[in-house]
Amino acid sequence: MCIRDRLKGTHREVMIAKFLMPVNTLRRINIAVPPKAEYESGFSKWVEHFCRMGSILGCRVHFFANERTLMRLQQLVKKRHAGTPTEFSILEEWEDLLLLTGQVNYDHLLVVVSARRGSISYDTSFERLPAQLGKYFSNNSLIIIYPDQFGEPQEIVSFSDPRGHNESQHYEKVGKWFYKWLKKN
């Protein structure tokens, strides 16, 4: 079953991970957050996952997002995860994701918050994500996360496809990229 089918068939949080080193040796968790991610129903859940992970590992969690999303992240972290060492940096445009290449070292974990097609934080630039990650972050530990969505899978109607037709081949591209990467390594 390809990733697209898996994502379309569930409203649950899905993480795709590639670790190049033991998790307990990570020094930093860098999280790239798309605009409007704060409006997704699973927002608080994934923030909690990575703040807890940072606390347990004793490493800093560094969020990169636009100004509005960063404000919401700061409020949430201050309220629920004040003991977690965090940093917040502005990532003006999601297309600037490549600017993170200078921020992510070999002993860092890069987390890319993605979205299912049709959700409020979905961006067409997600279509280029597999190629970008493969080209610029191939030597980094990586997690791509698709946050929780409300409703049962068959009840979800997206903005881009209100009739619920087969969504796209983009999830399949991510799956093929991971398959090729795993096969290569």
Language model segments and positions:
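Repeated scaffold domains used in trafficking and secretory/extracellular systems
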Residues: 96-99
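PAPS-dependent sulfotransferase catalytic core
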Residues: 102
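Intrinsically disordered or low-complexity boundary/linker segments at protein termini
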Residues: 1-94, 105-109, 114-185
